[in-house]
A protein has these predicted regions:
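A short glycine-rich, Lys/Arg-flanked "PGG" loop and its adjoining helix->strand segment in the class I
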Residues: 120-135
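A C-terminal cap/extension of S-adenosyl-L-methionine-dependent methyltransferases
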Residues: 186-241
Length: 241
């Protein structure tokens, strides 16, 4: 996570699917074909995605501002693993990497951008860190209509639209390779539980239902719809010319 975010519960890997084994196959299926061998991950959480990237043969620079999570990432890897952990927010990390003239062929940002107030600056920094032809891979919550108390409680500044992503890419000089919705079946449960009933937190039971029922079914439906219609999340693949 980066910048304006809530600590406490956000450090609990059981609450956020992208840091769990349940959600990892989804992320890998969405991004595998676009990954390079030199990856910068912004908001690496507990390191589950970084661990997968290393297994795929990538060199990983994992950025994580929360000390407890940064320690978890370091604990996952042996001294010989091709991983560097930067304990900083995205602004500090990008500045340090720029000072080293360090660039990447992939910048990965999963469920982080929605926590950042100045998302245009975030896009610009990511673009500057990419080599020509490099990819910026982003996964965020979609549909401002769904914005609710749970978004505020977990530090979400916004939920995204395709239009906003196109604007951000233009501003940063990036080309949109693909922009698709994900998780159409998650819309109704989210709307009922968090928007209408105004539940203030994510429970272990709801996480279990989400991981074991909604997420797998959504993945199947999304394969048919190919992210064209609507979904609870947005997935961006952008390219630096």
């Amino acid at each position: 996570m980066t910048e304006a975010h809530v600590v406490g519960s956000l450090a609990d890997e059981d609450k956020y699917f992208y840091n769990e084994e349940h959600g990892l196959p989804i992320i890998t299926s969405l991004f595998r074909g676009h990954l390079g061998r030199d990856v910068l991950e912004i908001g690496a959480g507990t390191g589950t995605i970084a661990e997968w990237l290393v297994r795929e043969g990538a060199h990983v620079t994992a950025v994580e501002p929360e000390p407890i999570l940064a320690r978890k990432i370091r604990a996952k890897f042996a001294a010989g693993d091709d991983v560097r952990v930067i304990e900083a927010d995205s602004v500090g990390a990008y500045a340090a990497l720029a000072a080293e003239a360090r660039t990447f062929d992939t910048v990965l940002c999963v469920s982080v951008l929605e926590h950042i107030a100045d998302d245009a600056r975030e896009f610009a920094m990511a673009a500057a860190a990419l080599r020509p032809g490099g990819r910026y891979l982003v996964f965020v919550p979609a549909m401002p209509l769904l914005y609710s108390r749970i978004d505020r409680e977990t530090g979400h500044v916004r939920r995204y639209t395709k239009r906003r992503f196109r604007e951000l890419c233009r501003g940063a000089g990036l080309e949109v390779v693909s922009l698709r919705y994900f998780e159409v079946l998650g819309i109704l449960p989210y709307l009922v539980v968090y928007k209408l009933l105004r539940r203030p937190s994510i429970t272990s039971s709801s996480t279990g239902v989400y991981n074991n029922v909604i997420l797998p079914l959504s993945a199947l439906v999304d394969k048919v719809l190919r992210g064209r219609l609507i979904g609870k999340n947005l997935v961006l693949v952008a390219r630096k010319p």
